[in-house]
């Protein structure tokens, strides 16, 4: 296991701990919005800001954990793992700061959250992967190696499909997209025909009815 793989595992643990705090906060709001054991949606209007903050936290955590899981499968891709660790570190900082700010509102123990903030692993991840120098090195590598995207983990067949759609998007759609959106124009035939040739229509219609979805 590489050092970056180890750090990704540590980051996952930290992310999971924050996720539990978010769930505790959600349970607190649910309790406050319940009447006679039933959830009252009208009461939730009084909790719009905390609910928004928690939704944002959960979205960030889910994205970071998904990125981490993906990167752990690519043990030979140093850059991918470094980028994932940078994203995880940024997410840890963002979510924890948001929870600390809303702790009283959502029934969390601010002292416990601050203990997490001073935790050894948390500080190590931030100091290592959220530092200005590290972010600068990632940017330099992206520019220097002309990195356009990360490994897809797709099969050879699906990678060919991805590349085909990528070329269509860049060679056919991109040159026309601004004009279409800016002036609210109809989608031209060149795009519709190309999309049809790629099988973009009828994907949810069973084959027995002339669609592309397997019966």
Predicted regions and their residues:
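Flavin-dependent oxidoreductase catalytic core characteristic
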Residues: 1-213
């Amino acid at each position: 296991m590489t050092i970056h793989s180890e750090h990704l595992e540590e980051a996952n643990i930290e992310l999971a701990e924050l996720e539990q705090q978010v769930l505790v906060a959600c349970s607190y709001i649910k309790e406050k919005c319940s009447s006679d054991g039933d959830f009252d949606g009208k009461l939730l209007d009084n909790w719009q800001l905390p609910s928004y903050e928690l939704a944002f936290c959960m979205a960030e955590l889910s994205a970071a954990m998904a990125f981490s899981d993906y990167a752990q499968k690519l043990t030979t891709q140093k850059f991918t793992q470094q980028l994932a660790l940078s994203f995880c570190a940024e997410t840890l900082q963002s979510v924890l700061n948001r929870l600390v700010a809303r702790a009283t509102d959502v029934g969390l123990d601010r002292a416990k959250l601050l203990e997490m903030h001073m935790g050894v692993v948390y500080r190590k991840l931030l100091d290592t992967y959220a530092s200005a120098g590290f972010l600068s090195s990632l940017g330099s590598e992206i520019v220097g190696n002309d990195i356009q995207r990360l490994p897809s983990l797709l099969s050879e067949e699906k990678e060919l499909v991805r590349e085909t759609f990528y070329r269509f998007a860049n060679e056919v759609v991109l040159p026309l997209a601004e004009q279409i959106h800016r002036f609210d124009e109809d989608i031209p035939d060149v795009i519709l025909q190309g999309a049809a040739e790629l099988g973009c229509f009828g994907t949810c219609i069973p084959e027995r009815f002339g669609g592309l979805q397997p019966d």
